[in-house]
Amino acid sequence: MRIGLIDVDGHNYPNLALMKLSAWHKKQGDIVKWYEPLFDGFPAPPLDRVYMSKVFTFTPDYEFPVNGKEVIKGGTGYFYPEGGEPLPEEIEHIFPDYGLYGIKNTAYGFLTRGCPRGCGFCIVGHKEGRKSRKVANLKEFWNGEKEIVLMDPNILACRKHTELLGQLIESRAYVNFNQGIDARLLTPENVTLLNAIKIKKYILRGTIRETKKRLFQS
């Protein structure tokens, strides 16, 4: 099969779903490429399948006609707030194709999904559920990369967070908690675990200045 991919939001930030779709189709022996309207559009022969992924609702939709026998749209940008159909399990848990975006030393992924908070500005509770749960081990999307971008909405709320933080510690990679850390769950035990991680970037959610100081106490 000839597979086309469209990152509707642009290529400024790697789309994890597209990287997984690329990895799975390449494993099947399919030809995977970025859809290019100049070369793949009409009157060129249609691609067998084109995936269009849109994360943000404010992103304008793709402006060009899509020349594909089958066109599949996905992402919260198209299906707000439910998020649309999830990826099949065999695709969801495949190692991402980081080469799609030319990524060499950074891993992207989720160890947990869901969040109990239900904040009015956030769709995670509606989309992923009001309970944080483990969905993967680190090895599922990390293979020695120097940096890990962790996209978990609330890893500390997961019952297995101690195990998962231990995996991050053992990796010795720099970790970017890009969705933040819930300051309300900063127990002394959790602070000790976080102090053992090589944290590159973090945001404290639901906090005050005094709570922020606790994160890196010796």
Locations of the language-model features?
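A general structural motif
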Residues: 1-2, 29, 45-47, 68, ...
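N-terminal [4Fe-4S]-dependent radical SAM core
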Residues: 1, 73-112, 122-147
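A structural signal for short, well-ordered beta-strand segments and their strand-loop junctions
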Residues: 5, 34-36, 71-75, 108-110, ...
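Core AdoMet radical
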Residues: 5-6, 10, 51-55, 124-218
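A short, structured N-terminal alpha-helical element that caps or precedes a catalytic domain
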Residues: 1-73, 79-80
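Short, aromatic/basic amphipathic alpha-helical patches
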Residues: 18-22, 61-67, 83-87, 163-168, ...
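Cys/His/Pro-rich metal-binding microdomains
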Residues: 116, 120
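Structural alpha-beta junctions
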Residues: 25-32, 67-79, 85-90, 169-176, ...
